C-alpha cells in the first residue's frame, strides 16, 4: 500500500473518531456547544412582582436545620401524594445518604393536595419522616410548575445557605456521591460546607473568607434544544398559542425536568423574574424560559439521563451516570443493592478496566440496545 494512501486512510479514521467523540453518544459536542449559549442570551430582564404562591400545608421549616453545616446539595423530589411506595424506595436507597465526599446532603419530597384522600396519612408520614413539604394546590401534572416554584421558594426562605439544589422526580435514581463529585469539580469555593464545622464557626468563615464573593451561577442538566410547543389538546404537554404564540418560535434551551441542578444564586435570580415569564405548565420549559430572562444559560451534562432509562448495570449506576429515569420502586432497591452491596458497603471496584475506559459511551449503548 503506498504511503500516501495509508496516510489518507489514517487521517480519515482520525477524523471519524473526532466526529464520533464530539457528536456521537458521548455527548461531548453537546456539552461544548452549551458553553456558547451564554454569549447568545439577551440582556437580563428586570425583576417582577413577588410570586403569588399557595400556602404551605406542611412547611417543615426545620427540615434544612440541624447542628451541622447547611446542605451542600439539597434534593427536591417532586412526588404525588399516593406515591408512598416510590418515596419509601428512595428513603431506603439513595435518599438515605446524608453525607457524600464529606459534604452534607438532604433529600425532601414536594407534593400538593391529594385527590379524594384525607390529609391524615401525609401528616403522619411527615411527622415520622420529617422530609415532606406540602402546599395547598391540586397535585397534577399540569401543576408541576406551581409545585417546582413552591419548592424553590421554600429553599430560598428556609434553606438559603444550601449551595446546590437538584430538582428531580420520584421515578429517578440519583447517584448522589458522583453528583456531589461533579459539582465539586465544576468549581466555586466550598470551605463553608466543610464537614464538621459548627454553625457559628461556619458563619464566621463565610463572612471572613467569602465577603463580597458571588456564589457561582449554575444551571446544569440534560439540555433540550429547539423544542417546539405541542399543539395537540389531548397531550399532557399541550401549550396553547395564547401561552406561547407561534411567532415566538421554539422554546429556549432548557434542562430536562427529570433532573437538573441550580446553584442557590440561580434559584434566587429565577424567582425574581418568574412572575414575568409566561406561565407554562411544563415546569422544565418554564425554568428554562425564566433562566433565559436573567441571562442564565443551561449547561449540558451527558451524565444526567434526561428521559433515558438505563438498564441496571453496576458500572453505569455506580460510576458514570448521575441519574437514570423510569426506575420503579423495586428497581430502585435493586440498583441500590447492586451499587452498595447487600451489607451497604462497596468492597470492589464498580467497573473493570475496559468498562472504565469506555465510560458513558458504554452506558448509552446499553440503553440503546435495551430500547
Swiss-Prot record:
Enzyme type, top EC level: transferase
Residues in the Cytoplasmic compartment per record: 1-4
Basic and acidic residues: bias regions: 194-207
Gene Ontology MF term list: ganglioside galactosyltransferase activity; glycosyltransferase activity; N-acetyl-beta-D-glucosaminide beta-(1,3)-galactosyltransferase activity
Pfam families tied to this protein: Galactosyl_T
Location (main, coarse): Golgi
Entry membrane topology: Single-pass type II membrane protein
Pathway: Protein modification; protein glycosylation
Keywords for the protein's UniProt record, in alphabetical order: Glycoprotein, Glycosyltransferase, Golgi apparatus, Lipid metabolism, Membrane, Signal-anchor, Transferase, Transmembrane, Transmembrane helix
GO terms for cellular component: Golgi membrane
Highest taxon, organism lineage: Eukaryota
Family: Belongs to the glycosyltransferase 31 family.
Described purpose of this protein according to its UniProt entry: Involved in GM1/GD1B/GA1 ganglioside biosynthesis.
Xref: PANTHER family: BETA-1,3-GALACTOSYLTRANSFERASE 4, BETA-1,3-N-ACETYLGLUCOSAMINYLTRANSFERASE
Annotated protein name in UniProt: Beta-1,3-galactosyltransferase 4
Organism name: Rattus norvegicus
Recorded name of the encoding gene: B3galt4
